[in-house]
Amino acid sequence: SLARAEGFTDSQIVRAIWYTEGGQKAHYAYGIRSVRYRDIAEARRICYNTVRNNRRRYAQYGHKQYPDYLSFLASRYCPTTGKLSRAEKKLNRNWLKNLKYFLMKGEIKCK
């Protein structure tokens, strides 16, 4: 269904993004740098909306270019191309792998 990507709900993906981006120690909550937010709760809503909206975009057209939703989300949420420094590109390369790690870690905890 559209509400699940590779067996994960939007909420699970958002929780994994929280950890991928550094959790409580992160300088930018949920990695949100493009817009200002008042607090962690607002940053979570922005992240959740991004996950939900990109799931719809993946269903509409992203599936033509990306093998799965999480790869598409990574291309939007934490790109490795474009106007980025060499350091940002290098750092962002690990984002999808780290996201999947935290998704699987969360799944194991829930069982």
Regions found by a protein language model. Give the residues of each.
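Short acidic-hydrophobic catalytic motif
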Residues: S1
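Non-catalytic cell-wall polysaccharide-engagement segments
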Residues: A5-E6, S34-K111
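Short, functionally critical alpha-helical segments immediately adjacent to catalytic or ligand/cofactor-binding
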Residues: F8-K25
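Acidic/histidine-rich, surface-exposed loop or edge segments in extracytoplasmic proteins
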Residues: H27-I32
